[in-house]
Amino acid sequence: QFVRDARIAQLYEGTNGIQALDLVGRKLPMHNGRLLRSFFHEVKEYIEENAFNYNLKEVIPHLMKSFGRLQQATAFIASKGLSDPEEGAGPATDYLKMFALTSLAYVWVKYIDISNRKMNDDPKGFYKAKIATGTFFLNKVLPETGALMSSIMSGASSYTKYEDDFFESSFS
């Protein structure tokens, strides 16, 4: 069991790294950023339409904050990556995590909105549970985007200045 878990962890980390590099190196610049701009436009439009939605007053600010961070991180990585590919690749995994958390936040806010509208037809508490789960995610998990933002903005120097010999000297 331990060997299998250790192997799965290696595959998981490698796969995430590859997906992150693909996001930053291929999808971000694809068609001059049109792919990401399309998603950003959808989220921005939803936020603008629901900024004063009473049912979302507790949660929409969390989405707004993480979405702002994602936009800022995207601009940072795009500008750095154009001049130095390593600068774009260095924070790729953190960027992928931030993108995932913000995307999930967007979906949770939409679920909460729908659930609030269906509360009167909820004898088993399904929609109440959706609201509670989504609110938990937005309050307790989504704030991780703040730490990810700090890591992304620190650039790739922590990676690029670390020499291969350092690994060997650590175990001597």
Enumerate the predicted regions with their spans:
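Conserved phosphate/anionic-ligand binding catalytic regions in large, soluble enzymes, centered on
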Residues: 1-25, 93-106
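C-terminal amphipathic alpha-helical interaction region
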Residues: 27-31, 42-172
